[in-house]
Amino acid sequence: MIIAGERDVDLAVALGALAERGYARVLAEGGPTLNGQLAAAGLLDELCLTLSPLLAGGDAKRILAGPALAPEHGWRLHSLCEQDGFLFLRYRPR
């Protein structure tokens, strides 16, 4: 068991504890809230996006929720794959 915060999870503490246990890679498939918290804490080292050729309506949220982030040095496209019109993009920080 990892305790990483009193009430809310301190993501930096949690990831540090995982690293101490030998888990150097963590895949976070969270929603906008978790993604926003990771980005705000500077804990993202890769961003994978999928673009679909299908249109859907509704009230979809952005991929990051929370306060606005200051633009940093940006991200660079690391790889791009296409299959059946879907684009799979992998970005890494500059």
In which residue ranges do the predicted regions lie?
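Enzymes that bind and transform nitrogen-containing heteroaromatic metabolites
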Residues: 1-94
